[in-house]
Amino acid sequence: MGSEFGLANLRSVQSGGREMKRQGGGNNTKTPSRFWRWKMVVQSLEGVGSVQSSIDVAANPHSEDNSSPKKRRVSSRLQVKQKPQKELLVRQRVELLDDNEQGPRKKQANVRGRQTGEVADSEELPKATDSVEKSDRVRVKETLRLFNKHYLYFVQEEEKRAVKAEAQKKASRAAKRGAKKSKKGDLKKADTKVAKRPDLKALTKMNDEKEILFPSKRFGSIPGIDVGHQFYSRAEMVAVGFHSHWLNGIDYMGQSYSKGKYSNYTMPLAVAIVISGMYEDDLDNAEEVVYTGQGGHNLTGDKRQFRDQVLERGNLALKNCVEQDVPVRVVRGHDCKSSYCGKIYTYDGLYKVVKYWAEKGISGFTVFKYRLKRLEGQPLLTTNQVQFINGRVPQSISEIRGLVCEDITGGLEDIAIPATNLVDDPPVAPTGYTYCKSIQVAKNVKLPTDATGCNCKGSCVDSKTCECAKLNGSDFPYVHRDGGRLIEAKDVVFECGPKCGCGPSCVNRTSQRGLKYRFEVFRTPMKGWAVRSWDFIPAGAPVCEYVGILRRTEDVDSASENYYIFDIDCLQTMKGLDGRERRSQAVCIPTVNSLERPDDHRSDNVPEYCIDAGSNGNIARFINHSCEPNLFVQCVLSSHHDIKLARVMLFAADNIPPLQELTYDYGYALDSVLGPDGKVKKMFCHCGAAGCRKRLF
């Protein structure tokens, strides 16, 4: 996929939603000059959270170096002012040093401009360069996103196989009843077998394509994976090279590692273990663990031992760790309904194997025991890292601290969205807007007629015959799992519309079903209002639509203090204008009048339409910027096929645990914002991400 979405541009924020106001941190924050028009372009699924390809970030949260997206276009109202600096600015980048390349700390920037969020002319800021280095943290996130993409692809393949097998089964039953005769061998043996798990197929593909992040095993910590990192399956650990076995509890180096830099060690040696209650003899006292060796127990039943364990392979590897003083990575598994495997795995840090022995286990068979002690000086697992496992998520609105509004939607949404404020004194609720559930259309905007739909009945299942599937590149963009998940980002997603023969349960209507997660709007000290979910959100799941008033861009008053304008620039992205990279997931664009007008070139550089959420909007207006966001933007077409009027949807870029703030990258080009005096404006970023670029623009 391309490195940038470029699907929509955002202009700043006022009282309710964007970080533009929040940089000052408080109700008294001064709104930026009303003559400004800021542009923000959202990154792609591959780059949204970790800022890929054209923009990479360092894992060190204290770094004063910055990174910025590729220089992007701005609105026509700013082009004249920016023209003298354009050629210079388009080449500028901010250098980011990786952990191993971190230079001397720069002097802390003067923050006298914090009340407005702007940077004073005298303040020292990092200089822009062309050097950008990708951090280990970013590489881990990219790899997990790649795994999720492969996983969802094979989920779709399994769904197809199941549909085909069910059809063959029905045909076979009909033949037996004499309804019709089927030829011998109609029911293929391959279709009657249990399919290989999609996650294991994804790992096989990643291994074949050499996409495993750290394919060679190593002692100690894995770069980019800190204590508290959570994996939503054993397969995710394999994908990044953290633990190379999707089933065994002990990962170890075999004899093949006895050469080279490990020639002084006696192999095998253990590198990681998983504690997840697989053995009846395990004892766990947090800082000290008695771990039972592997082998001889019932994997699929009650986990009881049925034969003696043998001191070989993983068991021998842990014994050798005692004798050679080699620490192992310890991962703790917890039951979690949100994970497709029923568990979630949290990295607890490095442990030293201090002792081993053999004894008769509870079931009467010989087992090997290992005493492990946690190494000192490591960060502890904090409450916010495990709170969703231990039930800290509020079960009802009455349990919320700092409640200032029980439902900001006024009952319009099926699920109430409360607002909380533990920052202001006295606490205040979000104001200055009217909540609306769906797009409102300005009087002078005429929507296209409904597009001709597919002829599917009930639900679309056959991508070869469904006309909507063909528009998406001959297959459906979603899978059924978890209520519908987008496999990967596309230039635009074509969903089934009002003239299609399928019903509301069709998988190709996934983004049309409204909000399905329990959200909360909460006040932050530095960024104003923010949004989080009480529920786990899987990668690829639709989160919400950006809702407001659909207007012509030329009708937006440049002098008004409205900073919730979201330009619909899907067409500009698809045409690759202004140096934007096009995605590999090309789609078939239907011929519509709006794309054939002879004067179409006039709107190539500036989108014709925008969504104004200033006075009317939904929960999306409260979602903040982050340099490492967990959401991405996707243009969607359903009722019509005019790309210039596409719906703007926010999807989960990662598996998002409960209570984690929802964010996406506003995508400013560095030094792209000019004030009324023609000078470049600068603003600090307070997103708090480890790879924060320090400047919003």
Task: Name the predicted role of every residue range.
Residues 2-125:
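Extended, intrinsically disordered, low-complexity regulatory segments of metazoan chromatin-modifying
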Residues 111, 115-146, 150-346, 444-448, ...:
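Acidic, glycine-rich low-complexity segments with interspersed aromatic residues
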Residues 337-344, 550-557, 670-681:
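Short, Lys/Arg- and Gly-enriched loop/turn segments at beta-strand edges
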Residues 338-396, 656:
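Compact mixed alphabeta submodule
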Residues 373-376, 381-483:
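Intrinsically disordered, low-complexity acidic/polar tracts
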Residues 509-639, 644, 654:
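Catalytic cores of histone-lysine modification enzymes
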Residues 650, 658, 662-697:
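C-terminal interaction modules of eukaryotic adaptor/scaffold proteins
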